[in-house]
Amino acid sequence: MSVKIFGKGKKAALKRRHARIRKRISGTAERPRLVVTRSNRHMVAQIVDDNAGKTLVSESTLMADFADFQGTKTEAAKKVGELLAKKAKDAGITTVVFDRGGNMYHGRVAAVAEGAREGGLAL
């Protein structure tokens, strides 16, 4: 998987970091990959089986569960992790590989991981 990403900006650097991480991390049916995508306003977390190329479970701050949520973005990210863990347990998933998507493991990305752990997922 050699992807040429040109540019000097933050988005290009993020894509280069994510490409480096994806060389080493892949999800299987037994241990799928938990992918975290972060924007300025929202968080998206998906559990993906890379062998089948399918998203097994997903949760986001864009979903109906967050229509009346009042709190900080970090609190919302933690709730995303907790709700994702609940959906994953219902689907029979207990362990995952964490893919931070090229972002630093800090703040909202770490909050998603903490929420998933508190919800019962093993990262």
UniProtKB/Swiss-Prot annotation:
Disulfide bonds: none annotated. InterPro entries: Ribosomal_uL18_bac-type, Ribosomal_uL18_bac/euk. CDD domains: Ribosomal_L18_L5e. GO terms for cellular component: cytosolic large ribosomal subunit. It comes from the Bacteria. The keyword Ribonucleoprotein applies. GO terms for biological process: translation. GO terms for molecular function: 5S rRNA binding; structural constituent of ribosome. Signal peptide: none annotated. SUPFAM superfamilies: Translational machinery components. Keywords: Ribonucleoprotein, Ribosomal protein, RNA-binding, rRNA-binding. Transmembrane segments: none annotated. Part of the 50S ribosomal subunit; part of the 5S rRNA/L5/L18/L25 subcomplex. Contacts the 5S and 23S rRNAs. NCBIfam families: L18_bact. Belongs to the universal ribosomal protein uL18 family. This is one of the proteins that bind and probably mediate the attachment of the 5S RNA into the large ribosomal subunit, where it forms part of the central protuberance. This is Large ribosomal subunit protein uL18. It comes from Bifidobacterium animalis subsp. lactis (strain AD011). The gene is rplR.
